[in-house]
Amino acid sequence: MAAARWGGGGGLPIGACLLFGKTAGVFSYGDHGTTFGGNPVACAGGVSIVERLTKDLLLEVQAKGDYLKTFILKMKGVETVTGMGLMLGIKINSDKSAREIAESCLRKGLMILTAHDRLRLLPPLNITKTEMNEGLKILNEVLAE
């Protein structure tokens, strides 16, 4: 199994190649590399994230995602909000493209991502309610323009 995640190392990119069973002995040390693998700082961040992953944290993340969805669905032009936890996709019905909306948000201090015609939110798991409210305010202002 291969895994790579931008931000999985506590905000830093990290990657891994995990081998099991018959494949466990296929690679020797140094035979294989990864763009995001082996960085000691990212690895320390990744270990910290894994150590903090508890049922309570995941329930908190789900609650934060539900909070965001509730407010985003009330915003002008929002058709749907999909996703799980804090990984959210927002389908917009607007004359502006998702990219234009994201650029307007960035100018006001909110960095969001896009995927084709959708806005994507990927805040850190430890985002505070105050930070969520600041982001929701900016997104609401931009969508209302």
Task: Locate predicted features.
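Conserved N-terminal phosphate-binding loop of PLP-dependent enzymes in the Aspartate aminotransferase
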Residues: M1-E145
